[in-house]
C-alpha cells in the first residue's frame, strides 16, 4: 500500500528566525453534519449574513415584495422609467479610483497603480465627487474623541528571550509637503500636513469635504528626496544610533567645528515613527479591496452603518503596472504574529528595531538587514533597494524552511468520457484538438517541467502507458472491475511532457480515431476518479474531468432527483445542495486536498447532471466547473475549446496555502470561494488560478485605538517555474470614530459582491425567497442609516438623487447605484423566482463564489450595446486608438425595430435582431440574404466580411469578449423566437418582468419603507 506523504502547509505561524518548523497539522477529518455553504468541515459556523458580530438583532422589517406582472405581451408592455438614458453603472476596470468614471465608491487609502485597463473600459461614467482620507481638510471643530480603554497585548505564540519595551506615544503627522497635479486618472493618497506638536494630544481624524469635480486632475504629494545610500552601514552595530550625534571633524588649517550632540526632535521622531499610506506603498486594488476604505473604531459604529465589512482578494490578478517584484533576500517576520515585513512597520532606535503594524510587538532588526534611518525623510537609507519596504505587493523567494518536500512540477491528468453521447455530440473530438493546441504552452510555462497523463472511461477504465518505446505508440490497459480498481505504478502513466511529446501526440490521435461500435451509455466516473487519484497522489497537480452523463457506476453513483415538483417552493434550495449520494465526492475531494490535487470539471449532458453534488469536487479542491447543457460541437464547440485552452494556460499557483492577518480589533468571520479550511485561519488551495478570488466577511471585536488599521494576506505557493514563493499583500487604512464618515469610503463593487455571496449562503441554508428578502432588507438598512447620518450632519454626508423623473430618494454618493444592483441581483438567474433548471442555478451559484469584481457586477447588470454604428461614427485611424461604444440602460425604451443589439453578462452574449432591420445591413453583418436563412442552432460567431457594418459589429463583439477571462457563448434572438426571447427580456431589468417590479417601482417602495421607519 502506498504511504501517504504530508504535504506543505503554511509555516507562517510556526517558523521563527533560527528555528525549525513545528510538526504539520494533521489532516482535518470531514464530520457527518448538515450542509454548510462554506466547506469548513469543522466547528466554525457562518454567522447570519445580514448581521455583524456583536450586533443586536434588528426588528424584522417589512419585506419588499415586488408586484408580479399579470400580463406580459412582450418587451413593449412595460412600465418605463422615463425618457432619460442612464449611463452604464458598472465599474469596468475592476478597480474603483478616487476620480471614478462610475461613482465615488473608491475613497480608499489603499489605491492602486495609475494605469487603466483599456479592454475593461467600455463606457465612461457620470460625474462624481472625490474624497481623500489622507488630505488635511479645512479647519473644522474637532469632534470629541471617546476615552479609549487600554488594550491588553496579544499573547505571543513564541516567548522572546528578552522583555519587550512598551510602545511610546508619537505624533503621527508627517512634514507638510507640496501638492502637484499628475496626468493620470489614478489618485495619489496624500499624508496629513504637519501640525504643531502638543504634549499628550493628537489631532482627531477629519473627514474630507468635496473640493473639486470628478474630472479634475487629482493632486499628488511631492516625494521627499532620499539621501544617498551609506556605503558602510552594514559595519555599524545596530544597537548604536550614529545619527543622534555629530562626530568631531577638523580639516587641516581650519578651526575646530565640533558641535554638541543634538537630540531627536519630536518632528524627527514623528517622521520615523508613523508610516503614512501612500499610492506607492499600498497594495494595488486589483489584488486587494475593502468594502469600506476606512475602519470604524468600535463594533457599535459598524452595526449602526449596516454596510457589510469585507475584503476581496485576487491573488493572481493581472497588474497593468507589470509583474509583482520578487525579493530574493532573507524573509523578515514578526516574532509574535508572524507578519511579514512591509512598508507600514515602524522603525525604532535608528533602524535597530521595528514595531509590527499588526500586533505592535517590537522586534530586533537582523544585522544583515540593518540600515540607518534618515530623520529628514523618515526612511531607511537603502529604501530604493528594498521593494518589500516600498510596495504593498511583493513576492518573497521562500527558503528551505518553507518546504516539506521539493517543489513538484505542474501535473495535468485528463479523465475523458468516451461514452456514446461524447462521440456523437463532438465533445471528444473537440477536446482532443484543444489539448493538442496547449501542449507547447504547457511546456513553455513550466520551463519543460510539466507532466502529462490521460485516461478514458465508459463502463470500463482505459489507461495509456506513455513511456517512450521504439514505436512511440502507447500501451493500453483496460480495467473492467469497477469495485476494486487495480492501478499499475504511476510512473507508467505520468511522463515529462517535453521528453515524451511525440508519444503524447500519438496517444491523442489514437484516442480521437479509435473506432467505437458499441453505444455505451454507462459512466463510471467515481471509479475513474479513484484510479486517477491513485496515480497522482504522490505528486499532486490537476485532474481535468470531461463528463457527459450523470455518474452511474458502482462508485459515486448519483440518482436523478425528482426536481420538477420542488421548483418554486421553499424546498427548491435542497436541489442546490449536495445530495446524500454525493458524500463519495466530498470524501474524495478531501483526500485530493490532502495530496495537493485539484479537480476541474467540464460537464456535458442532455439531462439532469446534479452539478450541486459534483461541484463539491471543485469547491473543496480549489478547481473550476464548466457547464454546457445539451452540448453540440457545431454550436458550442468553439466556446468549449476556448475555455479548455484558457483553463490550462492561465497563470496558476500550485501547492498553495493562504492566511490573512489583521491588526488588533479586526476579526474574520467567514470565507467565500473554492478552498478547504485547514485551520481557523489557514486556507488550503491545491491550486488557485488568475480568475479566482477569495472574499472575507469581517467584523470588529473590540475598540481600535490606532490611527491606522492594517491587513495582510500571504499566499505560500509553488510557481510553475519550480520556485517556492510567498506572495504578500498589505494595506493600511484610516480608523474613524464617526459612522457618518463611513459612507464616504464605501466601495460599491466590493459591497455588491459581498452581499451576493452572503445571499447565496442564505439561499442554501434557508430558501430562495428568504435570500431575495434579505437582499432588499440590507439595501433598506443601509439607506436608513444614511438618512440618519444625513439628518444629523448634512454637510458631512453629501447625498444625490437618481434623476429628475425618479422619486426623491437620497443616496450616498459612493452607493448611489446600490438599488439598481439590488434589483438586478433579485432578478438574476441565481435568485430569480422564474422557473430555472437546478443544474444551471447551482452552477451559477458556485461560479459567483469565485468571480472577480468586474465580472460579478457585469453579471448582475449586463452591457447593452447597439451593433450598428452611430451616424457620427469615425473609424479609428490607428489600431491603438481607444474604442468605447455607448452602453444603454437595460430597458425596452432603447430597443428599435430596425436595430441590432447585444446584451452580455460575462457568461452569455445575446444578439437581438429587430424585425425591421434593413436587408442590406443584415447581409453585410451575417453574410446571408435573409434572417430565415440564418441557422440559430449552429451559429457561433459573426463572419468576417469586408464592409463597414461588419467591421463595426465585430469590433464591439471583440471588445466585449476581451473584457472577460472566459469565452462568451453567443445566442441569436429573433423577434419571433419564443425560446430565447424570454431570456433576453429577463435581462432588461429596469422594466417590469415576470420576475418582479421595474426599477422605478422599486425606488418608490424603497422610499416608502425608509419614510415609514
From Swiss-Prot:
SUPFAM superfamilies, per the entry: beta-sandwich domain of Sec23/24, C-terminal, gelsolin-like domain of Sec23/24, Helical domain of Sec23/24, vWA-like, Zn-finger domain of Sec23/24
Compositionally biased residues, Low complexity: 11-39, 47-73, 97-114, 136-223, 231-269
Extent of Polar residues compositional bias: 126-135
Superkingdom of the source species: Eukaryota
Region Disordered, annotated ranges: 1-273
Recorded GO CC terms: COPII vesicle coat; endoplasmic reticulum exit site; endoplasmic reticulum membrane; Golgi membrane
Protein name per Swiss-Prot or TrEMBL: Protein transport protein SEC24
Protein source organism: Dictyostelium discoideum
Amino acid at each position: 500500500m502506498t504511504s501517504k506523504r504530508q504535504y506543505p502547509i503554511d509555516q507562517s505561524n510556526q517558523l521563527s528566525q533560527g528555528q525549525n518548523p513545528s510538526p504539520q497539522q494533521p489532516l482535518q477529518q470531514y464530520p457527518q453534519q448538515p450542509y454548510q455553504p462554506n466547506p469548513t468541515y469543522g466547528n466554525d459556523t457562518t454567522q447570519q449574513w445580514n448581521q455583524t458580530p456583536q450586533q443586536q438583532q434588528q426588528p424584522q422589517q417589512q419585506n419588499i415584495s415586488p408586484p408580479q406582472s399579470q400580463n406580459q405581451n412582450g418587451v413593449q408592455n412595460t412600465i418605463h422609467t422615463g425618457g432619460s438614458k442612464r449611463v452604464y453603472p458598472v465599474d469596468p476596470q475592476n478597480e474603483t479610483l478616487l476620480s471614478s468614471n462610475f461613482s465615488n465608491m473608491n475613497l480608499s487609502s489603499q489605491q492602486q497603480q495609475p494605469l487603466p485597463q483599456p479592454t475593461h473600459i467600455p463606457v465612461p461614467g457620470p460625474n462624481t465627487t472625490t474624497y481623500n482620507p489622507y488630505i488635511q481638510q479645512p479647519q473644522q471643530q474637532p469632534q470629541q474623541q471617546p476615552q479609549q480603554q487600554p488594550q491588553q497585548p496579544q499573547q505571543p505564540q513564541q516567548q522572546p528571550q528578552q522583555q519587550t519595551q512598551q510602545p511610546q506615544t508619537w505624533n503621527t503627522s508627517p512634514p507638510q509637503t507640496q501638492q502637484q497635479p499628475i496626468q493620470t486618472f489614478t489618485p495619489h493618497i496624500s499624508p496629513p500636513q504637519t501640525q504643531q506638536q502638543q504634549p499628550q494630544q493628537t489631532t482627531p481624524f477629519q473627514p474630507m469635504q468635496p473640493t473639486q469635480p470628478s474630472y479634475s486632475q487629482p493632486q499628488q504629494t511631492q516625494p521627499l528626496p532620499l539621501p544617498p545610500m551609506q556605503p558602510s552601514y552594514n559595519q555599524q552595530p545596530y544597537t548604536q544610533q550614529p545619527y543622534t550625534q555629530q562626530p568631531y571633524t577638523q580639516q587641516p588649517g581650519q578651526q575646530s567645528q565640533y558641535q554638541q550632540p543634538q537630540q531627536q526632535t519630536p518632528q524627527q521622531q514623528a517622521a520615523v515613527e508613523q508610516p503614512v499610506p501612500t499610492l506607492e506603498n499600498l497594495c494595488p486594488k486589483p489584488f486587494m479591496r475593502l468594502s469600506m476604505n476606512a475602519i470604524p473604531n468600535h463594533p457599535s459604529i459598524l452595526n449602526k452603518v449596516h454596510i457589510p465589512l469585507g475584503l476581496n482578494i485576487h491573488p493572481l490578478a493581472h497588474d497593468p503596472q507589470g509583474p509583482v517584484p520578487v525579493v530574493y533576500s532573507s524573509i523578515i517576520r514578526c516574532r509574535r504574529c508572524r507578519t511579514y515585513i512591509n512598508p507600514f512597520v515602524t522603525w525604532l532606535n535608528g533602524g535597530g528595531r521595528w514595531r509590527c503594524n499588526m500586533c505592535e510587538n517590537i522586534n530586533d532588526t537582523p544585522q544583515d538587514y540593518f540600515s540607518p534611518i534618515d530623520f529628514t525623510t523618515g526612511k531607511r537609507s537603502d529604501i530604493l533597494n528594498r521593494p518589500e519596504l516600498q510596495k504593498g505587493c511583493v513576492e518573497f523567494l521562500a527558503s528551505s524552511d518553507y518546504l516539506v518536500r521539493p517543489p513538484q512540477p505542474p501535473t495535468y491528468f485528463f479523465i475523458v468520457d468516451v461514452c456514446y453521447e461524447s462521440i456523437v455530440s463532438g465533445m471528444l473530438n473537440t477536446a482532443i484538438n484543444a489539448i493538442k493546441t496547449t501542449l507547447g504552452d504547457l511546456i513553455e510555462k513550466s520551463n519543460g517541467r510539466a507532466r502529462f497523463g490521460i485516461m478514458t472511461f465508459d463502463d470500463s477504465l482505459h489507461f495509456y502507458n506513455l513511456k517512450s518505446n521504439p514505436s512511440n505508440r502507447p500501451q493500453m490497459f483496460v480495467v473492467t472491475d469497477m469495485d476494486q480498481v487495480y492501478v499499475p505504478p504511476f510512473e507508467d502513466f505520468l511522463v515529462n511532457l517535453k521528453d515524451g511529446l511525440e508519444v503524447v501526440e500519438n496517444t491523442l490521435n489514437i484516442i480521437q480515431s479509435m473506432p467505437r461500435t458499441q453505444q455505451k451509455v454507462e459512466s463510471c466516473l467515481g471509479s475513474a476518479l479513484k484510479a486517477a487519484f491513485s496515480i497522482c497522489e504522490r505528486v499532486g497537480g490537476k485532474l481535468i474531468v470531461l463528463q457527459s452523463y450523470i455518474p452511474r457506476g458502482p462508485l459515486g453513483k448519483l440518482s436523478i432527483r425528482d426536481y420538477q415538483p420542488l421548483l418554486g417552493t421553499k424546498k427548491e434550495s435542497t436541489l442546490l445542495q449536495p445530495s446524500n449520494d454525493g458524500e463519495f465526492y466530498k470524501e474524495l475531494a478531501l483526500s485530493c486536498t490532502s495530496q495537493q490535487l485539484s479537480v476541474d470539471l467540464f460537464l456535458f449532458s442532455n439531462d439532469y447532471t446534479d452539478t450541486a453534488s459534483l461541484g463539491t469536487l471543485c469547491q473543496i479542491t480549489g478547481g473550476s466547473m464548466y457547464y454546457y447543457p445539451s452540448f453540440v460541437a457545431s454550436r458550442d464547440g468553439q466556446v468549449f475549446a476556448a475555455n479548455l485552452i484558457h483553463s490550462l494556460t492561465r497563470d496558476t499557483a500550485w501547492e498553495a496555502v493562504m492566511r490573512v492577518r489583521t491588526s488588533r480589533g479586526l476579526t474574520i468571520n467567514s470565507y467565500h470561494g473554492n478552498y478547504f479550511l485547514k485551520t481557523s485561519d489557514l486556507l488550503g488551495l491545491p491550486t488557485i488560478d488568475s480568475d479566482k478570488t477569495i472574499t472575507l466577511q469581517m467584523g470588529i471585536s473590540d475598540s481600535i485605538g490606532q490611527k491606522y488599521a492594517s491587513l495582510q494576506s500571504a499566499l505560500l505557493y509553488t510557481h510553475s517555474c519550480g520556485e517556492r514563493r510567498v506572495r504578500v499583500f498589505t494595506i493600511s487604512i484610516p480608523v474613524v470614530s464617526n459612522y457618518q464618515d463611513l459612507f464616504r469610503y464605501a466601495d460599491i463593487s466590493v459591497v455588491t459582491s459581498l452581499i451576493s455571496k452572503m445571499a447565496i449562503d442564505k439561499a442554501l441554508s434557508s430558501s430562495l425567497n428568504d435570500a431575495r428578502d434579505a437582499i432588499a432588507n440590507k439595501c433598506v438598512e443601509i439607506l436608513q442609516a444614511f438618512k440618519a447620518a444625513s439628518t444629523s450632519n448634512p454637510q458631512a454626508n453629501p447625498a444625490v438623487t437618481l434623476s429628475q423623473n425618479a422619486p426623491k430618494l437620497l443616496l450616498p454618493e459612493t452607493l448611489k447605484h446600490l438599488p439598481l444592483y439590488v434589483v438586478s441581483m433579485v432578478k438574476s438567474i441565481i435568485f430569480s423566482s422564474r422557473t430555472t433548471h437546478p443544474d444551471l442555478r447551482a452552477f451559477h451559484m458556485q461560479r459567483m463564489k469565485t468571480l472577480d469584481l468586474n465580472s460579478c457586477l457585469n453579471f448582475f447588470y449586463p452591457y447593452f450595446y447597439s451593433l450598428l454604428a452611430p451616424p457620427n461614427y469615425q473609424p479609428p485611424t490607428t489600431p491603438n486608438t481607444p474604442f468605447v461604444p455607448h452602453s444603454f440602460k437595460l430597458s425596452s425604451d432603447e430597443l428599435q425595430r430596425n436595430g441590432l443589439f447585444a446584451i452580455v453578462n460575462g457568461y452569455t452574449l445575446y444578439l437581438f435582431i429587430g424585425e425591421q432591420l434593413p436587408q442590406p445591413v443584415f447581409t453585410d453583418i451575417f453574410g446571408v440574404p435573409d434572417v430565415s436563412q440564418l441557422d440559430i442552432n449552429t451559429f457561433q460567431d459573426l463572419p468576417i466580411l469586408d464592409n463597414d457594418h461588419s467591421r463595426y459589429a465585430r469590433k464591439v463583439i471583440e471588445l466585449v469578449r476581451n473584457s472577460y477571462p472566459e469565452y462568451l457563448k453567443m445566442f441569436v434572438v429573433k423577434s419571433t423566437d419564443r425560446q430565447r426571447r424570454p431570456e433576453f427580456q429577463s435581462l432588461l431589468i429596469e422594466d417590469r418582468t415576470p420576475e418582479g417590479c421595474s426599477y422605478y417601482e422599486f425606488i418608490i417602495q424603497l422610499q416608502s419603507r425608509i419614510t415609514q421607519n
